Amino acid sequence: MSEQKNYIRTTDENGSINISEDVIAAIVAAAATEVNGVYGLYYSAHKEATMKISRKEISKSVKLEIDGDDIGVSVYILLSKSHSANEVGVDVQKAVISAVEDAAGVRVREVNVHICGVVLKSKPQPAVEK
């Protein structure tokens, strides 16, 4: 049996726009992982950061509560070493609100940031082609 997905729906004189919760979750994940001090998403099944984010990993690391025209977000992250948990948490909240409201036009009611651990090794840098 497939899981029921929620949609954010907006309607105007031209018709309607339906945005899947998977799309919102992907926006949240991208915004959170771009914040300085975030090592990656916390993937509870493996208890590790993931550099390549799959839909399964997003669904375990980002939870949405859709209520009418606004949403509540919970995001589970790992902190990089030598960063302030409070500062990173606030930066993640700001980044998520901005990204979701700009990209999807949806009001974000709240962003709960769960810092599930600290990674002591350096974050791998993407390979640069020459």
Question: What is the role of each PLM region?
Answer:
Residues 92-96:
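A short beta-strand micro-motif common to beta-rich folds, especially ectodomain repeats
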Residues 1-85, 90, 106-112, 116-118, ...:
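Contiguous, often N-terminal, cationic amphipathic patches that form binding interfaces
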Residues 88, 98-102:
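Amphipathic, hydrophobic secondary-structure cores in small proteins
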